Regions:
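Sec-dependent N-terminal signal peptides
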Residues: 4-14
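Acidic (Asp/Glu) and glycine-rich low-complexity loops/linkers
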Residues: 18-126, 132-143, 149-161, 165-178, ...
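Short cationic/low-complexity microdomains
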Residues: 238-255
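Intrinsically disordered, low-complexity segments enriched in Gly and acidic/Ser/Thr residues
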Residues: 207-208, 213-216, 221-235, 242-245
Length: 275
Protein backbone atom coordinates (compact mmCIF):
# COMPACT_ATOMS: atom_id res chain seq x y z
CA UNK A 1 0.00 0.00 0.00
CA UNK A 2 2.59 2.56 1.08
CA UNK A 3 6.24 2.55 0.13
CA UNK A 4 8.81 2.50 2.92
CA UNK A 5 9.68 5.87 4.40
CA UNK A 6 12.95 4.73 5.98
CA UNK A 7 15.17 6.80 3.67
CA UNK A 8 13.63 9.87 5.30
CA UNK A 9 14.94 8.75 8.68
CA UNK A 10 18.47 9.40 7.50
CA UNK A 11 17.77 13.12 7.36
CA UNK A 12 18.17 15.42 10.32
CA UNK A 13 15.27 15.46 12.81
CA UNK A 14 14.43 19.04 11.85
CA UNK A 15 13.58 17.81 8.38
CA UNK A 16 10.39 16.36 9.82
CA UNK A 17 9.16 19.88 10.41
CA UNK A 18 10.07 21.09 6.95
CA UNK A 19 7.57 18.67 5.41
CA UNK A 20 4.79 19.66 7.80
CA UNK A 21 1.42 20.91 6.56
CA UNK A 22 0.55 24.60 6.56
CA UNK A 23 1.38 26.49 9.75
CA UNK A 24 -0.21 29.94 9.67
CA UNK A 25 0.01 30.45 13.42
CA UNK A 26 2.51 28.70 15.68
CA UNK A 27 3.83 28.54 19.22
CA UNK A 28 6.69 26.54 20.74
CA UNK A 29 5.87 23.62 23.00
CA UNK A 30 8.11 21.87 25.52
CA UNK A 31 7.81 19.58 28.52
CA UNK A 32 10.46 18.66 31.11
CA UNK A 33 10.01 14.90 31.37
CA UNK A 34 10.15 13.53 34.93
CA UNK A 35 11.73 10.07 34.60
CA UNK A 36 12.40 9.40 38.29
CA UNK A 37 11.38 5.77 38.89
CA UNK A 38 10.12 5.44 35.30
CA UNK A 39 10.78 2.38 33.12
CA UNK A 40 8.44 3.21 30.22
CA UNK A 41 7.27 6.44 28.60
CA UNK A 42 3.82 6.20 27.00
CA UNK A 43 3.18 8.77 24.27
CA UNK A 44 -0.51 9.34 23.53
CA UNK A 45 -0.33 11.17 20.20
CA UNK A 46 -3.75 11.20 18.58
CA UNK A 47 -3.31 13.10 15.31
CA UNK A 48 0.03 14.69 16.14
CA UNK A 49 3.58 13.89 14.99
CA UNK A 50 6.52 12.70 17.08
CA UNK A 51 10.19 11.77 16.65
CA UNK A 52 11.80 9.84 19.53
CA UNK A 53 15.56 9.29 19.62
CA UNK A 54 17.11 7.19 22.38
CA UNK A 55 20.82 7.17 23.18
CA UNK A 56 23.15 6.48 26.09
CA UNK A 57 23.19 9.31 28.60
CA UNK A 58 20.68 11.42 26.68
CA UNK A 59 18.90 14.14 28.62
CA UNK A 60 15.13 13.53 28.62
CA UNK A 61 13.31 16.21 26.66
CA UNK A 62 10.18 16.89 24.65
CA UNK A 63 9.83 19.94 22.45
CA UNK A 64 8.33 21.11 19.21
CA UNK A 65 5.69 23.47 17.95
CA UNK A 66 1.94 23.84 17.78
CA UNK A 67 0.37 24.98 14.51
CA UNK A 68 -3.18 26.15 13.83
CA UNK A 69 -5.21 27.93 11.19
CA UNK A 70 -6.76 30.10 13.92
CA UNK A 71 -4.47 31.71 16.49
CA UNK A 72 -7.08 31.12 19.20
CA UNK A 73 -6.79 27.37 18.65
CA UNK A 74 -3.16 27.31 19.75
CA UNK A 75 -4.14 27.43 23.41
CA UNK A 76 -6.01 24.15 22.93
CA UNK A 77 -2.84 22.32 21.89
CA UNK A 78 -1.00 21.35 25.07
CA UNK A 79 1.40 18.75 26.48
CA UNK A 80 0.76 16.97 29.78
CA UNK A 81 2.45 14.22 31.78
CA UNK A 82 1.25 11.92 34.55
CA UNK A 83 2.96 9.10 36.42
CA UNK A 84 1.22 5.77 36.89
CA UNK A 85 3.44 3.26 38.62
CA UNK A 86 6.66 2.92 36.65
CA UNK A 87 5.10 4.50 33.55
CA UNK A 88 5.10 8.15 32.52
CA UNK A 89 2.02 9.00 30.45
CA UNK A 90 2.69 11.88 28.06
CA UNK A 91 -0.31 13.23 26.17
CA UNK A 92 -0.47 15.60 23.22
CA UNK A 93 -3.85 17.17 23.94
CA UNK A 94 -6.19 18.79 21.45
CA UNK A 95 -9.09 20.36 23.31
CA UNK A 96 -10.84 21.46 20.13
CA UNK A 97 -14.14 20.75 18.42
CA UNK A 98 -12.63 19.03 15.36
CA UNK A 99 -10.58 15.91 15.76
CA UNK A 100 -8.42 15.74 12.67
CA UNK A 101 -5.47 17.84 11.63
CA UNK A 102 -7.48 19.35 8.78
CA UNK A 103 -11.20 20.03 8.42
CA UNK A 104 -11.80 22.18 5.39
CA UNK A 105 -9.52 25.18 5.92
CA UNK A 106 -9.23 24.51 9.65
CA UNK A 107 -6.30 22.66 11.16
CA UNK A 108 -4.52 22.25 14.46
CA UNK A 109 -1.61 19.95 15.16
CA UNK A 110 1.72 19.57 16.96
CA UNK A 111 5.05 18.37 15.61
CA UNK A 112 7.21 17.09 18.47
CA UNK A 113 10.68 15.70 19.08
CA UNK A 114 11.85 13.78 22.15
CA UNK A 115 15.19 12.49 23.41
CA UNK A 116 15.39 9.69 25.98
CA UNK A 117 18.15 7.69 27.66
CA UNK A 118 18.45 4.28 26.06
CA UNK A 119 17.26 2.29 29.08
CA UNK A 120 13.73 3.75 28.91
CA UNK A 121 11.13 1.73 27.00
CA UNK A 122 8.76 3.49 24.60
CA UNK A 123 5.05 2.89 24.12
CA UNK A 124 3.06 4.64 21.37
CA UNK A 125 -0.65 5.23 21.03
CA UNK A 126 -1.16 6.72 17.59
CA UNK A 127 -4.47 7.70 16.03
CA UNK A 128 -4.12 9.44 12.66
CA UNK A 129 -0.74 10.94 13.46
CA UNK A 130 2.77 9.72 12.73
CA UNK A 131 5.74 8.70 14.84
CA UNK A 132 9.35 7.67 14.36
CA UNK A 133 11.34 5.85 17.06
CA UNK A 134 15.09 5.24 16.90
CA UNK A 135 17.22 3.33 19.38
CA UNK A 136 14.70 2.39 22.09
CA UNK A 137 15.34 -0.82 24.08
CA UNK A 138 11.72 -2.02 23.77
CA UNK A 139 8.87 -0.56 21.71
CA UNK A 140 5.11 -1.04 21.81
CA UNK A 141 2.97 0.60 19.12
CA UNK A 142 -0.81 0.71 18.84
CA UNK A 143 -1.63 2.41 15.53
CA UNK A 144 -4.99 3.38 14.09
CA UNK A 145 -4.86 5.11 10.70
CA UNK A 146 -1.49 6.75 11.24
CA UNK A 147 2.09 5.79 10.45
CA UNK A 148 4.92 4.49 12.63
CA UNK A 149 8.51 3.88 11.62
CA UNK A 150 11.12 2.39 13.94
CA UNK A 151 14.70 1.21 13.66
CA UNK A 152 17.51 -0.01 15.88
CA UNK A 153 15.18 -1.35 18.57
CA UNK A 154 17.36 -3.67 20.64
CA UNK A 155 14.60 -5.78 22.16
CA UNK A 156 10.99 -6.67 21.45
CA UNK A 157 8.68 -4.67 19.23
CA UNK A 158 4.99 -5.34 19.97
CA UNK A 159 2.60 -3.80 17.46
CA UNK A 160 -0.96 -3.63 16.23
CA UNK A 161 -2.24 -1.62 13.27
CA UNK A 162 -5.70 -0.82 11.94
CA UNK A 163 -5.70 0.96 8.56
CA UNK A 164 -2.33 2.62 9.01
CA UNK A 165 1.25 1.61 8.27
CA UNK A 166 4.12 0.31 10.39
CA UNK A 167 7.67 0.04 9.05
CA UNK A 168 10.34 -1.66 11.19
CA UNK A 169 14.04 -2.26 10.64
CA UNK A 170 16.79 -3.81 12.78
CA UNK A 171 14.81 -4.99 15.79
CA UNK A 172 15.36 -7.65 18.46
CA UNK A 173 12.12 -9.64 18.20
CA UNK A 174 8.62 -9.04 16.85
CA UNK A 175 5.14 -9.65 18.20
CA UNK A 176 2.26 -8.50 15.99
CA UNK A 177 -1.10 -8.56 17.72
CA UNK A 178 -3.12 -7.84 14.59
CA UNK A 179 -3.03 -6.20 11.17
CA UNK A 180 -6.36 -4.85 9.97
CA UNK A 181 -6.50 -3.26 6.52
CA UNK A 182 -3.13 -1.59 6.88
CA UNK A 183 0.45 -2.67 6.21
CA UNK A 184 3.26 -3.89 8.42
CA UNK A 185 6.76 -4.30 7.03
CA UNK A 186 9.65 -5.67 9.12
CA UNK A 187 13.26 -6.12 8.09
CA UNK A 188 16.15 -7.69 9.97
CA UNK A 189 14.47 -9.24 13.00
CA UNK A 190 17.12 -10.72 15.28
CA UNK A 191 14.79 -13.03 17.21
CA UNK A 192 11.48 -14.84 16.93
CA UNK A 193 8.47 -13.38 15.11
CA UNK A 194 4.90 -14.01 16.27
CA UNK A 195 1.90 -12.71 14.34
CA UNK A 196 -1.70 -12.98 15.50
CA UNK A 197 -4.23 -12.12 12.79
CA UNK A 198 -3.85 -10.51 9.38
CA UNK A 199 -7.15 -9.20 8.04
CA UNK A 200 -7.29 -7.56 4.61
CA UNK A 201 -3.94 -5.85 5.00
CA UNK A 202 -0.40 -6.90 4.15
CA UNK A 203 2.42 -8.31 6.26
CA UNK A 204 5.98 -8.44 4.92
CA UNK A 205 8.96 -9.93 6.74
CA UNK A 206 12.39 -9.78 5.14
CA UNK A 207 15.12 -11.33 7.27
CA UNK A 208 14.48 -13.13 10.58
CA UNK A 209 17.02 -15.05 12.65
CA UNK A 210 14.49 -16.99 14.72
CA UNK A 211 11.25 -18.87 14.15
CA UNK A 212 8.19 -17.29 12.53
CA UNK A 213 4.61 -18.08 13.54
CA UNK A 214 1.50 -16.58 11.90
CA UNK A 215 -1.84 -17.59 13.41
CA UNK A 216 -4.25 -16.56 10.66
CA UNK A 217 -4.46 -14.73 7.33
CA UNK A 218 -7.84 -13.53 6.07
CA UNK A 219 -8.08 -11.84 2.68
CA UNK A 220 -4.76 -10.09 3.03
CA UNK A 221 -1.27 -11.09 1.96
CA UNK A 222 1.79 -12.29 3.85
CA UNK A 223 5.27 -12.44 2.40
CA UNK A 224 8.08 -14.04 4.41
CA UNK A 225 11.63 -14.47 3.17
CA UNK A 226 15.13 -15.15 4.46
CA UNK A 227 14.37 -16.95 7.73
CA UNK A 228 16.97 -18.98 9.64
CA UNK A 229 14.41 -20.90 11.73
CA UNK A 230 11.06 -22.57 11.08
CA UNK A 231 7.95 -20.96 9.58
CA UNK A 232 4.49 -22.11 10.66
CA UNK A 233 1.09 -20.70 9.68
CA UNK A 234 -2.24 -21.64 11.24
CA UNK A 235 -4.65 -20.76 8.44
CA UNK A 236 -4.99 -18.87 5.17
CA UNK A 237 -8.42 -17.74 4.00
CA UNK A 238 -8.73 -16.04 0.62
CA UNK A 239 -5.42 -14.25 0.87
CA UNK A 240 -1.96 -15.06 -0.43
CA UNK A 241 1.02 -16.55 1.39
CA UNK A 242 4.48 -16.35 -0.16
CA UNK A 243 7.42 -18.03 1.60
CA UNK A 244 11.00 -18.04 0.27
CA UNK A 245 14.45 -18.90 1.59
CA UNK A 246 13.75 -20.72 4.86
CA UNK A 247 16.52 -22.78 6.44
CA UNK A 248 14.13 -24.64 8.72
CA UNK A 249 10.73 -26.28 8.16
CA UNK A 250 7.56 -24.86 6.61
CA UNK A 251 4.13 -25.84 7.93
CA UNK A 252 0.66 -24.62 6.92
CA UNK A 253 -2.20 -26.15 8.88
CA UNK A 254 -5.29 -24.97 6.94
CA UNK A 255 -5.86 -23.29 3.58
CA UNK A 256 -9.03 -21.86 2.08
CA UNK A 257 -9.38 -20.36 -1.40
CA UNK A 258 -6.18 -18.40 -1.15
CA UNK A 259 -2.80 -19.27 -2.62
CA UNK A 260 0.45 -20.63 -1.22
CA UNK A 261 3.76 -20.16 -2.99
CA UNK A 262 7.01 -21.41 -1.51
CA UNK A 263 10.59 -21.93 -2.66
CA UNK A 264 14.01 -22.36 -1.17
CA UNK A 265 12.83 -24.36 1.87
CA UNK A 266 15.76 -26.32 3.33
CA UNK A 267 13.76 -28.33 5.87
CA UNK A 268 10.53 -30.30 5.67
CA UNK A 269 7.43 -28.89 3.96
CA UNK A 270 4.07 -29.83 5.46
CA UNK A 271 1.14 -28.14 3.72
CA UNK A 272 -2.43 -29.15 2.79
CA UNK A 273 -2.86 -30.98 -0.49
CA UNK A 274 -4.53 -29.12 -3.32
CA UNK A 275 -8.09 -30.27 -3.89
Amino acid sequence: MRKSLFPLLLLLPTAAFAASPECKHSQPRSLALDLAGVKTVVFNLGQHGLLVESSAGAKPSLQGKACASDEKRLQDLQLTQEKKGDKLLVSARSDISFNSIFLGNQYAYMKLSSTLPDHINVQLKVGSGDATVIGAPILSADVGSGDVQARNIRGLVAASVGSGDIDLKDIGALQVISVGSGDLVARNVNGNTQVGSIGSGDFTLNGAKGDVRIESIGSGDAEVRDVTGNVSVGSVGSGDLNITQVRGDLELEKKGSGSLNHSGITGNVNVPRER
